[in-house]
């Protein structure tokens, strides 16, 4: 079993993160899944939620992911997201304002998106 896996986190408009990791945790339609080197091949649908990547050097990278697909084979993990942003890129105060506005307007999609962004920030 290899000690690390290659991870590509890609949004529709850009490559968000790429590198070597020892563990990736993501939310799928079947529930949360942890992928480590040597994992069985998989293909799944991503739910909106934070994705946590434990890099090979022990750092933790967290991203807010909004829908997409996850694919793993031969120690290569691809996370193809409709929207994705690293927690370090998220302005928490702006996300709080967006959450409050979405709640006031009854916009469930915007509320879910702001909530995921805030959870990613708090997980970093």
From Swiss-Prot:
Belongs to the ATPase epsilon chain family. It is found in: Cell membrane. F-type ATPases have 2 components, CF(1) - the catalytic core - and CF(0) - the membrane proton channel. CF(1) has five subunits: alpha(3), beta(3), gamma(1), delta(1), epsilon(1). CF(0) has three main subunits: a, b and c. Its main location: membrane. It comes from Streptomyces avermitilis (strain ATCC 31267 / DSM 46492 / JCM 5070 / NBRC 14893 / NCIMB 12804 / NRRL 8165 / MA-4680). It comes from the Bacteria. Disulfide bonds: none annotated. It is a peripheral membrane protein. This is ATP synthase epsilon chain.
């Amino acid at each position: 079993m290899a000690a690390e896996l290659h991870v590509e986190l890609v949004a529709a408009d850009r490559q968000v993160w790429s590198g070597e990791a020892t563990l990736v945790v993501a939310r799928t339609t079947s529930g949360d899944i942890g992928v480590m080197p040597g994992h069985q091949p998989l293909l799944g649908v991503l739910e909106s939620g934070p994705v946590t990547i434990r890099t090979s050097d022990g750092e933790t990278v967290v991203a807010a992911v909004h829908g997409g697909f996850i694919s793993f084979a031969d120690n290569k993990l691809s996370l193809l997201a409709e929207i994705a942003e690293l927690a370090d890129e998220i302005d928490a105060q702006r996300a709080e304002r967006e959450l409050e506005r979405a709640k006031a307007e009854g916009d469930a999609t915007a509320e879910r998106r702001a909530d995921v962004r805030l959870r990613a920030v708090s997980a970093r």
